[in-house]
């Protein structure tokens, strides 16, 4: 809107002209656009490289603006009255043609002051709707509004395809005290590439991608993209209404973890579109309930697998457009599958176009490297003590859950957030205000995050990757916990894989590695993870961890999966594990699908499908996952034979799992059972349908009134080597 500038009489002093043309003027609205000069209205336009500029009134009257210096134009415009922001348009002659546009400096502030205040106070959860690039219509003029939080910057301009990436042309307005820079650019629409040119507090000018960009270029390009804001046509209303019940602790949850870039190679086609056509049906056919994706957020380095993201609001462009990702989620829901995303609020890379020193100061990160530099990954650590940073991160989480209908977030590297001395030697970390190692600000952030998700995204879940014994990770915030819904059981995973790697002849000496997990199984609500981390960096594949020849390896992997699926806790399996990938995972190559030409690998895949089916349909295997009454040891101390037997129960059903972790058959093996009567074999991992040799027990066994293991009834059977059996009581 035009404003009175009594000190300006139709010309600018030399210092102001120089600052404008040098790209150093911090308050462009004070000099550009329409201004009152006595009884007249003066219009000034900064258009370096333009040949001529005219102001055109609605009636067609044209007034040429005269160059004060090359690129800086000014004139009195007869007939132009105050108070009408879009009362004229500009006709600019460039070397390559004529441009007709409204003057961005003829418009008043475009961001709502109350929303800015709310945002500054940390209460704005939909930050992606306020900052970044948004289609807008101002006073009947269509365009894009840009906004960036950079409170310490001396000047900010938006640059892009629309202005030849010339940082002089579109300097932004500072909305004080929020520290937000804004500008409405007429005629800029979806697909336009842009960045922010920031003159920082340190005096350096840098180009930064938009932290709130909802679309970005594919690496190695680094620009942000004005998104297409047409709403996606979701078809998942029924799923969204049911998902809370599908994700409760008494529901069966079996997660298929996927790296979108290497699950299948579709010869250059848009990856989300092709994944949507293949992956949901595949995961559904194997009985999984959820797909968990390694981070899909925009990230500059593919070798990070997405765990060093810079675009916390934008899907990675390498896999397709944002609408393609929404389509993928919609197809998953159509197939009855939830979608969980890995999400990384623990750290970010220091790429020059990213968040690092965004306004010439350590804005998102800590200034002191003892707090702000991660020693393991050489990345920067978010300053959780800063209200605006917490708001930014929580807004990212809410954005994925609401805008993309995602059903849960697996929060990466929580342990590194909780401890100030994580991976740091003495003297290289700063204690908290109590002189201790706990990161109090990170604790508060995680609690605030989980509380916000619970309020803003009903039915969505959060899962912590937390590898220590921090108490109360899944306890409610009101009870002093962190408020997560689930926690990865890293201890169970490490103990049991260590056991399975051992030569079977030595396993008797390490029996506790299998049983110890039940000591703390109900301390949290757990997910049992066989994740991507266990099949990289020289660790080999899951199949390769099993000792012996190939047939023995497959038999042991079948046994291990059956043990896992019967054990309390939700399940997670990384892609390729379902059919026994032989090689270590390579993010640059697709899975070894050709292995499914081998009946033994097809058998393993069939077992995973059957385990998921049994797990989902037998309530005793899932409904008391968080209740100690749902589990009872029967044989927990037979280390000499490396045999375990335990019961999973609910109010009406009982299933007993018996596992032999050596190749030695145990003929006439007797174990107690809680009930008299018939017990039917529901799973036999040695069956020929799974690639085993067969020869297991009959399909139905009847208990005998012979006491064993504290029970008045018992079963006796010939227990094959490297075999797990599920026996269910027949009511």
From Swiss-Prot:
Gene Ontology terms: cellular component: cytosol
Pfam families: Alpha-amylase, Alpha-amylase_C, CBM_48, GlgB_N
SMART domains the record matches: Aamy
Reaction(s) this enzyme catalyzes, per UniProt: Transfers a segment of a (1->4)-alpha-D-glucan chain to a primary hydroxy group in a similar glucan chain
N-terminal signal peptide: none
The entry's keywords: Carbohydrate metabolism, Glycogen biosynthesis, Glycogen metabolism, Glycosyltransferase, Transferase
Biological process annotations from GO: glycogen biosynthetic process
Pathway this chain belongs to: Glycan biosynthesis; glycogen biosynthesis
Active site positions, chain numbering: 412 (nucleophile), 465 (proton donor)
HAMAP family attached to this UniProt entry: GlgB
Family in the record: Belongs to the glycosyl hydrolase 13 family. GlgB subfamily.
Subunit structure: Monomer.
Protein name (Swiss-Prot/TrEMBL): 1,4-alpha-glucan branching enzyme GlgB
Record organism: Bordetella pertussis (strain Tohama I / ATCC BAA-589 / NCTC 13251)
Species lineage: Bacteria, Pseudomonadati, Pseudomonadota, Betaproteobacteria, Burkholderiales
